[in-house]
């Protein structure tokens, strides 16, 4: 079982504010789709609510919540272990948020798909500190500069351990 975390993070690890992503980067949305399509995705309840309770198409959507989630295209799990038991064993599992789930799953992850956004605004939700682990090695990195569609500089990075 390969567990990966995918997130867009600001310079100070902000990932959200008021249950929304504080920036809009169409290229990052394409990157997210490319790296999660046809895979199992795990998310927490607040992330589920942030996507308006709509499962992401062409993915197995697994939501971790103490409150039961009833939706025909979603698997509800009340713990991380139950969520992992719901996954397809031979596929890469993509953890898509939020902060609590990232923090709990970081220990088990072997890959991080990060979009570093040159953003210094406020937030109330953060990605966990991952740089303290010296075992993470960058295996892919691509810089993008802001343009008419993407108002911030950003960089795609994949780390592995």
UniProtKB/Swiss-Prot annotation:
Residues 2-161 form the DHFR domain. One of its GO terms (biological process) is dihydrofolate metabolic process. It is an enzyme of class 1 (oxidoreductase). GO terms for molecular function: dihydrofolate reductase activity; NADP binding. Its EC number is 1.5.1.3. The keyword Oxidoreductase applies. Substrate binds at residues 6-8, 28, 59, 115. Pfam families: DHFR_1. The keyword Transcription does not apply. NADP(+) binds at residues 7-8, 15-20, 44-47, 64-66, 96-101. Belongs to the dihydrofolate reductase family. PANTHER family: DIHYDROFOLATE REDUCTASE. Key enzyme in folate metabolism. Catalyzes an essential reaction for de novo glycine and purine synthesis, and for DNA precursor synthesis. NCBIfam families: PRK10769.1 (NF008037). This is Dihydrofolate reductase.
């Amino acid at each position: 079982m390969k567990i990966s975390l995918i997130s867009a993070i600001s310079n100070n690890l902000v990932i959200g504010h008021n249950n929304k992503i504080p920036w809009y980067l169409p290229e990052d949305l394409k990157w997210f789709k490319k790296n999660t399509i046809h895979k199992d995705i795990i998310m927490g309840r607040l992330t589920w609510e942030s996507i308006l309770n709509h499962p992401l198409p062409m993915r197995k959507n697994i939501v971790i919540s103490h409150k039961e989630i009833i939706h025909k295209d979603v698997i509800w799990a009340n713990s991380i272990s139950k969520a992992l038991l719901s996954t397809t064993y031979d596929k890469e599992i993509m953890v898509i948020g939020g902060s609590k789930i990232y923090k709990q799953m970081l220990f088990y992850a072997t890959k991080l798909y990060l979009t570093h956004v040159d953003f210094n605004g406020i937030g109330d939700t953060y990605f966990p500190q991952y740089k303290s682990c010296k075992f993470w090695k960058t295996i892919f990195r691509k810089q993008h500069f802001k343009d008419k569609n993407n108002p911030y500089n950003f960089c795609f990075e994949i780390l592995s351990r």
